[in-house]
């Protein structure tokens, strides 16, 4: 499953294709959205924001297209007027004079006003996004120590989008390896220096993954700058302590860690 860095890179590609250009054709499959087709034609996409796995496509007239890919949704960039052959069902088409972005198969799609965005049930549930560059380590540390999260085991907390949006399994295990913590630890147990290190890693590792354009299934995920230290490396030696990396299951997901140096 894609995590925050992959979702943000997908949004970047969509932005690069149509941002700032007048929309010449807007099409929605769902009847309740079709009244917006004429209204949005001629407007521009100002930017595309991400909140976890949700994309918010903002239009110059003030409306926002909310879409969540869930399990099957996928965006494509094509030349204007092109209709690719696909077994998927087309849900959204936003086209400019030169390019079009197409959303297939997703079912969680809506057009929202600014007030509706602020009160959307999913967006109210998710925490701040780790790729929001205004989010600071100090704010993350405060969330770690909050009554809501301080007594949660990290194995589950780091998968909970209500804590921080954009984290997933590979980020979970890499972050915990980086700071030498096991998945069963809790923020309430940590020293101040451990909390500082964790708060920084929760932002630094996702942002490095995003910047370096890595691939999830490639061991050299972060190119020359960063390699997976534990993810999909069970049975190999830990580069920090020489122990053997193990694979177990925590919070119903595969969990990779080094018992020798993660405590």
From Swiss-Prot:
PANTHER family: ENDONUCLEASE 8 (PTHR42697:SF1). It catalyses: 2'-deoxyribonucleotide-(2'-deoxyribose 5'-phosphate)-2'-deoxyribonucleotide-DNA = a 3'-end 2'-deoxyribonucleotide-(2,3-dehydro-2,3-deoxyribose 5'-phosphate)-DNA + a 5'-end 5'-phospho-2'-deoxyribonucleoside-DNA + H(+). It holds the Pfam family Fapy_DNA_glyco. A zinc finger (FPG-type) spans 229-263. DNA binds at residues 70, 125, 169. Keywords: DNA damage, DNA repair, DNA-binding, Glycosidase, Hydrolase, Lyase, Metal-binding, Multifunctional enzyme, Zinc, Zinc-finger. The active site is at 2 (schiff-base intermediate with dna), 3 (proton donor), 53 (proton donor), 253 (proton donor). Its cofactor is Zn(2+). The keyword Kinase does not apply. GO terms for molecular function: class I DNA-(apurinic or apyrimidinic site) endonuclease activity; damaged DNA binding; oxidized pyrimidine nucleobase lesion DNA N-glycosylase activity; zinc ion binding. Belongs to the FPG family. The keyword Metal-binding applies. Transmembrane segments: none annotated. The lineage of its organism: Bacteria, Pseudomonadati, Pseudomonadota, Gammaproteobacteria, Enterobacterales. One of its GO terms (biological process) is base-excision repair. Coiled coil: none annotated. Its EC number is 3.2.2.-, 4.2.99.18. Involved in base excision repair of DNA damaged by oxidation or by mutagenic agents. Acts as a DNA glycosylase that recognizes and removes damaged bases. Has a preference for oxidized pyrimidines, such as thymine glycol, 5,6-dihydrouracil and 5,6-dihydrothymine. Has AP (apurinic/apyrimidinic) lyase activity and introduces nicks in the DNA strand. Cleaves the DNA backbone by beta-delta elimination to generate a single-strand break at the site of the removed base with both 3'- and 5'-phosphates. InterPro entries: DNA_glyclase/AP_lyase_DNA-bd, DNA_glyclase_Znf_dom_DNA_BS, EcNei-like_N, Endonuclease-VIII, FPG_cat, MutM-like_N-ter, Ribosomal_uS13-like_H2TH, Znf_DNA_glyclase/AP_lyase. HAMAP family: Endonuclease_8 (MF_01253). Binds 1 zinc ion per subunit. This is Endonuclease 8. It comes from Klebsiella pneumoniae subsp. pneumoniae (strain ATCC 700721 / MGH 78578).
């Amino acid at each position: 499953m894609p995590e925050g860095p992959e979702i943000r890179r997908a949004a970047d590609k969509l932005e690069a294709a149509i941002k700032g250009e007048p929309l010449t054709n807007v099409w929605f499959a769902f009847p309740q959205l079709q009244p917006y087709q004429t209204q949005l034609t001629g407007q521009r996409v100002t930017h595309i924001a991400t909140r976890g796995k949700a994309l918010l496509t903002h239009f110059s007239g003030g409306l926002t297209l909310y879409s969540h890919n869930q399990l099957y949704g996928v965006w494509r960039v094509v030349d204007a007027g092109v209709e690719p052959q696909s077994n998927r069902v087309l849900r959204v088409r936003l086209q400019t004079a030169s390019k079009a972005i197409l959303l297939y198969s997703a079912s969680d799609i809506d057009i929202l006003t600014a007030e509706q965005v602020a009160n959307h049930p999913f967006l109210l549930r998710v925490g701040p996004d780790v790729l929001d560059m205004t989010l600071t380590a100090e704010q993350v540390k405060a969330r770690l120590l909050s009554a809501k999260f301080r007594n949660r085991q990290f194995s589950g907390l780091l998968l909970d989008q209500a804590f921080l949006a954009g984290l997933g399994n590979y980020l979970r295990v890499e972050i915990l390896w980086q700071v030498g913590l096991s998945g069963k630890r809790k923020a309430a147990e940590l020293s101040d220096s451990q909390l500082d290190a964790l708060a920084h890693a929760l932002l630094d590792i996702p942002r490095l993954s995003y910047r370096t354009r890595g691939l999830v299934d490639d061991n050299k995920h972060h190119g020359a700058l960063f390699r997976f230290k534990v993810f999909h490396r069970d049975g190999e030696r830990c580069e920090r302590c020489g122990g053997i990396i193990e694979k177990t299951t925590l919070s119903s997901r595969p969990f990779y860690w080094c018992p020798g140096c993660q405590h």
